[in-house]
Amino acid sequence: LTHPAALFKIRAVQASDAAAWRQLRRALWPHADDIEHARDIARQLDAPARHACFIASPPGILAPVGFAEVAVRHDDVNGCGASPVLFLEGVFVEPAARRRGVARALCAAAAAWGTARGCAAFASDAPLENAASHALHRALGFDKTERVVFFRKPLAR
């Protein structure tokens, strides 16, 4: 795929996109099974005021090569002082379509959607060890706010 991002069609997903969306989600989150992906997709489609997913397709090709999922959050989001916040739950572009501005175009569509819903900021997170994700976030204009390690301790029942 040699097309610049301007040629990619960016649009909000519809229920009819569920199979292609699930395939892209599998590539980003391979640890989740198809039941979990189907449940997440249904939950997002059932709450269009809170969730959105945008997909990118190259010219003349129906199958999407990338997606960005976002959610409007009203809780405390690290590094954001105001609410609501648009949160990037996940962004993925197939390797053959990367470095062409597709992720940027997907996130721009998501940001416009969040702005229309009154979001004060666009936030995201990434594992500490995922340097590629950190680089992508910086390239998309995100500023690092915190580095966090989560802990847990089981409680006896």
Say what each PLM segment does.
Residues 22-36, 76:
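Helix-loop element at the rim of GNAT/NAT acetyltransferase active sites that forms part
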Residues 32-55, 69:
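Active-site rim helix/loop that mediates acceptor-substrate recognition in acyltransferases
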Residues 93, 99-112, 135, 139:
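Conserved acetyl-CoA-binding loop-helix of GNAT-fold acetyltransferases
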Residues 119, 138-147:
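Conserved acetyl-CoA-binding loop of GNAT-fold acetyltransferases
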Residues 123-133, 152:
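Conserved beta-strand-loop-alpha-helix junction that forms the acyl-donor binding cleft
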Residues 114-126:
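Conserved GNAT acetyl-CoA-binding A-motif
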Residues 55, 63-72, 87, 92:
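Conserved beta-strand in the GNAT
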Residues 8-21:
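A short beta-loop-alpha structural element at the N-terminal edge
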